[in-house]
Amino acid sequence: MRMRALGLMAAALGGLIPLVLILGGCGDKGAAQQKQATEITKGIEDYLALIEVPGQPLRLRHDKVTVTPSEDGKSYLVAITGLRYGTETAAMAAFGEVDYRLTPEGDDQYQVGDLKMPNEVSVAGKDGKPEATVKFETTAFSAIWSKPLQNFLKFDWQVKDIVASAADQPGELFKIATASVTGDGKESGKGLLDQISKLTLSGFTATDPQDGTSFKLDTLIGNVSFEKLDFPAYRQMMAKINTFSTKYAQPTDGSAGGGATPDAPKLTEEDSKALADLVRGFPKLMSAYGYDFSAEGLTMTNARGDVLMHLTHGGLALGVKGIDTDHAEAHFGIQHDGLTVNGPMFEDPLARATLPTSGNLDLVMTDLPVPSLVESVAQAIPELTSADPQVAQGAQFMLMGGLMSALSQSTIKLRIDPSALETEKARLTADGELKLAMQTPQKAVGAVNFALVGLDDLMALATGLANENPEAAQAVQMMQMLQSLSQRETGGDGKPVDKFKLDLTEAGQVLVNGKSLEEIAP
């Protein structure tokens, strides 16, 4: 449990920086190129030590870093050999050697170019047996590295013809026509970094070898951004986490006798306090973080080529700002458009009429009590990372209690920005605002407004099917209840609109248009 928690912390922090950071270089400009090369080598080794997480048995590894002054007298040739992912004795993914050129640009930056790396990566299982091969071709690479920040300010990696093949079966697991990873950042002063990283994939295809089901995706775009990332503090925190991971790693040498695995070292009181302080410091690393993904043209077909599902567009977004303040704000959004599903289930007219072909949900949560929530985690983290299962389980209850206490004293609000679901026969919209109220039965108070267009059409369809379809009969009863609760108006297009105001009261009542659900519900 301890190592899982430490590993998750390292992964969460490490996920802020693209894996391509291994390609960077550092070092201050010296009078002699050889001295500069030595400094660059040390900088690369130091950074690799951070992202390789030495305390984890399964991790990124390398053999050696070599930096050589080039013949032009200005740039440096860098070679990282033995790059791989796996255990100390077995590589699950072998990347081989990565070479590139560093060219000083002013006093604080390097241009990174002339990337050379294998165009084939072998993937193996934990037993070392080959499982798959991934082939690709790099078409372009460029980057600008900041020496003060020890990170990329800009990078652009373009790849094409990505093909993955299994070792034990013919054919291809998946193909990607083109892919790119780009980043655009700027230093906002005092070691703070603002950056947006973007991943773009196009022409993705894959086939399930078991049943022949095929997947096709025209485009996938993902963005990850952060603001005012304190890079010096980030490096220090990563170094401390790596120290903890190494110091309290689970032994694997069987020294406990009888081939048993010995217990991990017990966390000292001093290290328990240090680990808790690490958690408390996490919100100060940055002011905002967010990501979003969007997909275009997702199609699934069976072995005969029949379209089982198609989605024209889908998207997901999550962002948090004010992380370094007492009251943060979070946004969550999800949307889709052009959804069609074929199959026996959707031969039923009612199922087809109620399939949400498009929709969106936009939520904004304000007044998140960052300090009190983080303090709850900090107090529980030493026990959560305990190797004793009973202690770790007790810490989970302690954490839940601390979080509930923090929430009960907060003023969190949830705002539902205009959201909607649309089907073949109807359209439902919603908006409103709720406030957290842990003392009430529903744990919230406030109001949400709903508007439904097409209730009459759905009722007519369900009524016509009710005699032969039990589910349609149940739907009729539900829609009759909705009609009894509705406040009907006429929309701008002349169609009837059934409106519902859902109120959660301080007294614990649930009201719909002023009527109590307890009195109406059967």
What residues fall within each predicted segment?
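Glycine-rich, small/hydroxylated-residue low-complexity segments
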Residues: 27-522
